[in-house]
Amino acid sequence: MGTEATEQVSWGHYSGDEEDAYSAEPLPELCYKADVQAFSRAFQPSVSLTVAALGLAGNGLVLATHLAARRAARSPTSAHLLQLALADLLLALTLPFAAAGALQGWSLGSATCRTISGLYSASFHAGFLFLACISADRYVAIARALPAGPRPSTPGRAHLVSVIVWLLSLLLALPALLFSQDGQREGQRRCRLIFPEGLTQTVKGASAVAQVALGFALPLGVMVACYALLGRTLLAARGPERRRALRVVVALVAAFVVLQLPYSLALLLDTADLLAARERSCPASKRKDVALLVTSGLALARCGLNPVLYAFLGLRFRQDLRRLLRGGSCPSGPQPRRGCPRRPRLSSCSAPTETHSLSWDN
């Protein structure tokens, strides 16, 4: 049983996607979890398929629009927006596998299990880290218009940051890539994360803590710091667009906290129990399992919401999307074709207007 002590009921990037009918946790009595298992089989496929449909459609449009407009290399934010859409698109591609596994069991073998689990984990982490990159880009875009502001980032530097983010995400995905496997459970094949017997509880807990710290705490800290500075700039600015830009800032931070904070807290509490080898009563263990299922589903929702928050709110993106749907595209040269928007010049006088590009008109 020791090898399965960290198997959780969520299909998140820290665990397998199914629970045991009998708990593998250190419980004071045998705990039969058929009711939790039944809830998981109903809840997980519905959430996975809904988010997959929204994520594939929304992020597919973002990728197609940016590539058609050839704006991906013009600014760091455009480059990171493209990477964010790619990460969310890859994440959405893994969700139908989770839904099928929950409904009828896993039938694709251990190699595919490790591949899908690793892709899920890497894209999940990459998405949150690119959100932090976009926040930092927005702060630099405003601060560089001020006296003694930081030097603007170059597209080449943005591409280097993107490579680092993906490498870090792959590092965080190593447990899923190495230890996910196909196995029999209660008469059905399951794709689960099962740590080797020789791995201590401390190592398992430290892995989960590192993922929460880098996958949630770091991006949240960067977002709050950058948007707080941007909010202060907006409060000092004048113009009719100031209030709308402030609402965008609040919406971005609030969406991140509401969607990801509950799952991160639930996972931290579960990790604390693991590290302390704390015993739970059967009802408490069931409540924890349901909480992990529901909050991990909530965390997945940002895969479908990111295109709305970070792209569709942008005026220039909507213009590019309409042009794409009409079958046109814009060249990337200094003299754009008729109907293609010009990139505004940034000056100290235009800082409030550039701040309004918090709706990501880049």
Swiss-Prot record:
Biased composition (Low complexity): 328-338
Keywords attached to this entry: Cell membrane, Disulfide bond, G-protein coupled receptor, Membrane, Receptor, Transducer, Transmembrane, Transmembrane helix
A Pfam family the protein falls into: 7tm_1
Extracellular side: 1-52, 100-114, 180-203, 270-290
Disulfide bond residue pairs: 113-191
Region ranges (Disordered): 328-362
InterPro entries (UniProt xref): CCR1-9-like, Chemokine_CCR10, Chemokine_rcpt, GPCR_Rhodpsn, GPCR_Rhodpsn_7TM
Cross-referenced Gene3D superfamilies: Rhodopsin 7-helix transmembrane proteins
Molecular function GO labels: C-C chemokine binding; C-C chemokine receptor activity; G protein-coupled receptor activity
Bilayer-spanning residue ranges: 53-68, 79-99, 115-136, 160-179, 204-225, 248-269, 291-313
Primary location class: membrane
Tissue expression pattern: Expressed at high levels in adult testis, small intestine, fetal lung, fetal kidney. Weaker expression was observed in many other adult tissues including spleen, thymus, lymph node, Peyer patches, colon, heart, ovary, peripheral blood lymphocytes, thyroid and spinal cord. Also expressed by melanocytes, dermal fibroblasts, dermal microvascular endothelial cells. Also detected in T-cells and in skin-derived Langerhans cells.
GO biological process: calcium-mediated signaling; cell chemotaxis; G protein-coupled receptor signaling pathway; immune response; positive regulation of cytosolic calcium ion concentration
Chain intervals with Polar residues compositional bias: 351-362
Protein's cellular compartments: Cell membrane
Topological domains annotated Cytoplasmic: 69-78, 137-159, 226-247, 314-362
Keyword Membrane: yes
Assigned GO CC terms: cell surface; endoplasmic reticulum; external side of plasma membrane; plasma membrane
Lipid bilayer topology: Multi-pass membrane protein
Sequence similarity: Belongs to the G-protein coupled receptor 1 family.
Function: Receptor for chemokines SCYA27 and SCYA28. Subsequently transduces a signal by increasing the intracellular calcium ions level and stimulates chemotaxis in a pre-B cell line.
The protein, known as: C-C chemokine receptor type 10
Organism: Homo sapiens (Human)
